[in-house]
Amino acid sequence: MYCKEIDNMKLLEPIKVGPITLKNRIMFPPMTTGYEERDGSISKQSFNFYKRIAEGGVSYIVLGDVAPVNTVSPTPKLFKDEQIPAYKELADALHEFDCKLGIQIFHPEYDVQALAEMFKKGDMQAARAKLHHDMLHFTDEVTPEALNTILKKMGECVRRAYEAGVDVVEVHGDRLVGALCSTVLNHRTDEYGGSFENRTRFALQVVESIKEHAPHICIDYKLPIITDNPLRGKGGLKIDEAVEFAKKLEEAGVNMIHVGQANHTGNLNDTIPAMGTQPYCFMQSYTKRVKDAVSIPVSAVGRIVTPQNGEALIENGVCDIVGYGRSLLADPDYVKKIEDGQPCRIRLCMMCNKGCTDSIQNRKFLSCVLNAENGYEYERTITPADDKKKVVIVGAGPAGLEAARVAAVKGHDVIVYDKDTQVGGQLNIASVPPRKEEMNRAIHYLANEVKVLGVDLRLGKAVTSEDILADQPDEVIVATGASNFILNIPGKDMPHVQDAWKVLSNEQFPAGRIVVIGGGLVGAETAEYLALRGNDVSIVEMMDTIAKEESTTIRPEMMADFEKHGVKQFTNTKVTEITATTVEAETAEGKVSLPCDYVVFAVGARSNAFDMTALEEKNIHVQVVGDANKVADINSAIESGYLAANAL
């Protein structure tokens, strides 16, 4: 089990990296957050986010994608001296926790100045066309003179960082630097193209520029590897060349190397794989090749979830430093809990990518569906209640359990009722479809927390308001969740018509030709689940997209499964009737008749009602949270449970 304590963990040992010493081997690797000001300066939200992670015990934090120019990208920027004080304030704050600050310097693959002029003129069509062109051709078309200008701007950025007290500069070896290194993307015939020496020339010039502008700063280098499947990333080096280049980086004065998956495809699942799409620690074989070739420290990233994952990487000589990215979003106190001998209490990341990766791709700020404080650090905090209360919670799904956890942390006496004999609510079926088993970590965390905190958990008991009154509560939180909705159409009560939730919970077992009515997330997951078991599956959806709510990093995997297993998709299609052998439907083109042995309903959920009359008559304050209030997702469930309980 991940919660088993490990004695004398190497993860907690200090390590010397060039001119600095890290207090432990756990780093927060570069991630785009969307927290910065419009000009890329450090905002209060950004400052609080990084400070909170430092407070949790990590030794090294890297700000991702820091641009030395005013790009259109929503990333941090350090292109003018006026931005230095904010970076200095952040560096000073991290240093209070003995945490080193790094910036990952990068340059995008487009003409920043030309695009800025187009945006200034309001010529959006030309700007979009220019951006699209440059993303495909800038690597080949950028002149040596322009590259020299970029080098100077990078050097000035490094100088500003050093003046701000930044400890480490990490070269982003992907993006423009990685594209120039790549045999896949670089087709140049000048001194920056062709041979290995030429393709890596600019990268080494960046390193030299850092040394020139900040001779005493620690230098990190993100070394992107083009793995066995080059479609997953093109902007970097294949492993044999990467190993040779790592040696050159060490010779050039780089102090550590951060090995990662190359990415130049626009799909963040390449570098930040979602649950079930890549093995844990999926980059370890490539990282070890690099580690074996150099004597400087090497860091590893890539679906590293548990303390045991990281410890094994160090023990097995794969790396010296471990990057926990999404894991620290889920639980910024990850390191403290290891140090305190409480790894069981770590809120482990599910790797769902909904709050983090999807948010960034949708131009929202970074968040975590399991951590309601993420993005609101030092604004949302759990503090002891002024008055101890008895709190009764109805429902032990994610909203109810989170409310119970928070209320207990605040010092209240908490009772939780649930009609089922196990906790977790809908998470128990959400973790069944392909790739979704990792959602069980959320159940494990919440169940363990309420146990540790002494919550009185009363399972297998359906309660009424009158029952609750016997407990003499001061506060009641209703978290009764939702139930699958069966569409009222002719034939819905026939014996071969089933419920997607019951299918996923192994209460019903359709087989043969199956029509799933509803192509939302549950319908699509159920269809995939049934197709992988050898059934002939069709999905009928009224809207124009199947699984629209699925993570953008997972949906391509689902669609690939649909194609592989022959799942037929009918969008913009309305079901009109179910017969003994068919599902009748209508499209804009006319009627469709789908033969079937079974029909499975997955058209959505409806909130479960709870009669609060008796409680209201006694003037007991009642809050309704999660799907019981409004059907949504786990993010909404956790957040509403947190906020309701924290207000007590």
Could you describe each region identified by the protein language model?
Residues 416-453, 529-573:
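Rossmann-like dinucleotide-binding cores of NAD(P)H-dependent redox enzymes
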Residues 23, 318, 470-472, 595:
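Alpha-helix C-terminal capping/helix-to-coil transition sites in glycosyltransferase folds
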Residues 270-276, 320, 427-435, 542-547, ...:
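Short beta-alpha connecting loops at secondary-structure transitions
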Residues 219, 298, 457-459, 497, ...:
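Generic structural signal for residues in well-ordered beta-strands
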Residues 2-394, 398, 402-409, 413-414, ...:
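Flavin-dependent oxidoreductase catalytic cores
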Residues 444-485, 576-582:
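Feature captures the FAD/FMN-dependent oxidoreductase FAD-binding
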Residues 386-417, 458-466, 480-493, 501-552, ...:
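Rossmann-like dinucleotide/flavin-binding elements
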